Amino acid sequence: DNGKKISIKYQINDNSYQINQSITLNEGFEDTDFINLKWKNKPYHQELNTNNEKNQSTINYLDENDNFDYLDYPSTEDESIEISNPIKWISFKQQYFISSIISNDLFYDSKLFSLHEKGDEFVKDFIIESKIKLINNSINLDYYFGPNDYKILKEISTDFDKNIYLGFETIGVRTFNKYVLIPIFNFLKNFTESYGLIILLMVIVIRFIITPFTYKSHISMAKMKVLNPEIQAIREKHEGDMQKSQAETMELYQKTGVSPLGGCLPILFQMPILISVFYFIPNMIEFRGQSFLWANDLSTYDSILRLPFTIPFYGSHVSLFTILMAISIMLMNKTNMQMQASMEGPMKYFQYFIPIMMLFFFNSFSSGLTYYYFLTNIATYGQMNIFKKFVDESKIKDEIELNKKKNVNSKKSSFQIRLDEAMKAKQNKNKK
């Protein structure tokens, strides 16, 4: 009309998930600076766990300053945002697949909509409204329609691999996954095609690396076990006076050279690894569709029994890997209780509460993840029992007694001095 003509060309590359689109306007559009873009996509439900798939589906985007952001993941409400900064790329992300649009010339005045779908046929309803600036009356766009495969995504565009959620950047979880777990995972894939065996090998490698920390934790707990009778005697001596009991206990720790946190700190060192795996296994597409033992798909939950009803917070299926994980946690807690000073009050029952809570929490999680945690707990349990055979508690007791003699006239620590001052202040206040 009026001599106006739009030319649209597509280029499909062999062995690639990318499509290039070029749009050219002829001279009849000489007053046109921008093209309006509107893209709608309603991805079909693809995975076994519909709720989890919806929770993993959202819109991701990267602005011109390389700031990555996204709409709220697990929301059951309609989400939308207006973005003033120009954008480099936008992705409709599902759990294991994405549809993305990438522009070298940036998207302007973008509006993103993620609309909740109540049924099970579609995951969500995604909409993009944006403007693209014309350069010489043309624009070039790249589309990516493919898997959330880290190896592929990192080659597509700047920070495009962030479409795979590998954990928090701020506490180093994503960094650990990128530079430690993914290289280990890719290396182990060279030796076997069984992803169940790859998970087993990952556990062995990681347990080997952190064995010195596990051993240090065991030694610290063994010292606390030897010291426990004296701690109990102090508690009985100052029953009803917690401050005096704490002050004398701290003095005992100082004289014996035993740290009450010695057994905790090495264990805390392992927490980032467990958290990293929590994001790693469920988000790596390599596990999708991979069977192992009774699990048909390591990317979703395993089910050995379908229930004719739904248990609140549990579900309508029974995951055997989750049960095994819960049992392994109980074994770990029992061993730790034997090594540590006896617990009192509600803490005594905490060791039973945690496995039950994990049973409910992890029942619908990836079977690959619960299998990994089960193996990790069993490996740790085995290590601790091996350490028991090599740790001589009588030698530890002799070492503690020797430290007592060395430190009999040692000065109080600054913490002990402050604690004594606080006790005296409280006693003076009570006298008044």
Residue spans for each PLM region:
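Soluble non-transmembrane domains of integral membrane proteins
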Residues: 1-163
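Core alpha-helical transmembrane segments of integral membrane proteins
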Residues: 166, 171-233, 265-269, 273, ...
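Active-site-proximal binding-pocket segments
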Residues: 249-250, 254-261, 267-296, 300
